[in-house]
């Protein structure tokens, strides 16, 4: 729900399609507004079903998983429909954590993330050389 223009929905769509998911992309923006995002999906776009410029309630009643763009308000009537029909609500981060099989190291905070990430990289390269 919400392909978006900034890349998150695009990467998630490509990953889902690559792994054989049956994908419906629905966004309130129309095809013209999303043309660059659709183009970025590339050859995989033909595997998806698009509902653009509107949402269809049936999509939220019949799909098992709804991947929600962070810009979509939590009180959206379509998310309520999905919840009422027992769909799992996911986002790109929750999908990543669900399907990533490797250990994850996360670095958060206001300052020092790049330095900390570089130190972690340095330590791991010494411990696990290729």
What are these model-predicted stretches?
Residues 15-18, 57-61, 70-130:
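Phosphate-binding loop of NTP-binding sites
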């Amino acid at each position: 729900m919400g392909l978006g223009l900034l890349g998150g929905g695009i990467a998630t769509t490509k990953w889902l399609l690559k792994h054989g998911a049956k994908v419906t992309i629905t966004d309130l923006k129309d095809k013209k507004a999303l043309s660059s995002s659709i183009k970025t999906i590339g050859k995989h776009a033909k595997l998806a079903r698009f509902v653009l410029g509107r949402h269809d309630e049936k999509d939220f009643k019949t799909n098992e998983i709804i991947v929600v763009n962070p810009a979509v308000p939590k009180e959206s009537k379509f998310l309520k429909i999905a919840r009422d029909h027992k769909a799992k609500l996911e986002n790109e981060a929750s999908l990543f954590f669900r399907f990533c099989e490797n250990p994850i190291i996360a670095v958060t905070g206001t300052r020092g993330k790049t330095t900390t990430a570089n130190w972690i990289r340095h330590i791991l390269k010494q411990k696990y050389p290729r």
